[in-house]
Regions:
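Residue-level marker of positions within ordered structural domains that often coincide
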Residues: 19-20, 84, 128, 150
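Short, T/G/N/S-enriched strand-turn elements that build extracellular solenoid repeat scaffolds
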Residues: 91-169, 173-204
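Feature responds to low-complexity, polar/acidic, surface-exposed segments characteristic
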Residues: 1-48, 60-77, 85-99, 123
């Protein structure tokens, strides 16, 4: 419950921060078993739901001793490994992309167009997208779209882009997500949109 910016953080603190940043659904992982790990009783009660979510999402595998070591300070190498487990592909350069992606994709720049492709995982629009435009043109996302960046110039969903779960969580400014006029409600009747408490979202 305290902030110590100059102090190391523990593994369970790191898992909590990452799970929150990814907006993992804790309820989806309430039944996730941690029985494969030793000393799991060391996990603090406040961190347990987030640790379950990270394990249940296959982002945390424990160490060679089958330990989560939740109270140990996390190393840079361990933190890097967590992100390697989470993100399979990064887009760092503006432009148009047409290849399919297997696993989670993170966009870290603005003015990106994804066209005629499938993302077999989550699409995370990171803070690096800032206030730029992100366009999905005939894109299928099998996981979630998590919007941390992209401003009022908008994140565009065009030409039958297929999305099941959309989470808007930008906290440093407004973010607009627009489904184009050629798309019908029938295409998106099962869509689930979540706007986090601190985020601002504006319709067209």
């Amino acid at each position: 419950s305290t902030m110590d910016p100059d102090e190391p953080i523990t593994r369970q603190e790191a898992m909590t921060v990452v799970a929150r940043a990814l907006q993992l659904n804790l309820e989806d992982h309430e039944e996730t078993s941690l029985s494969q790990f030793r000393a799991r009783a060391d996990i603090s009660a406040w961190a347990l739901p987030y640790v379950r979510a990270m394990v249940g999402s296959d982002y945390i595998h424990g160490n060679e001793k089958r330990e989560l070591a939740p109270r140990d300070n996390i190393t840079r190498a361990e933190f890097s490994q967590i992100f390697h487990n989470i993100i399979q592909e990064y887009l760092l350069t503006s432009g148009t992309y047409t290849q399919d992606y297997a696993g989670n994709l993170l966009i870290r720049t603005d003015d990106v167009t994804l066209r005629d492709l499938t993302i077999d995982g989550d699409l995370i629009i990171g803070c690096g997208a800032a206030d730029g435009t992100i366009t999905l043109d005939n894109v299928t996302v099998t996981g979630r779209i998590v919007v941390w960046g992209g401003g009022t110039d908008a994140v565009w969903m065009n030409n039958g882009t297929d999305v099941e779960d959309l989470i808007v969580c930008r906290v440093d400014g407004p973010a607009k997500v627009i489904f184009d006029k050629d798309s019908t409600l029938a295409v998106y009747q099962d869509i689930e949109v979540t706007v986090t408490d601190r985020a601002e979202a504006f319709p067209e």
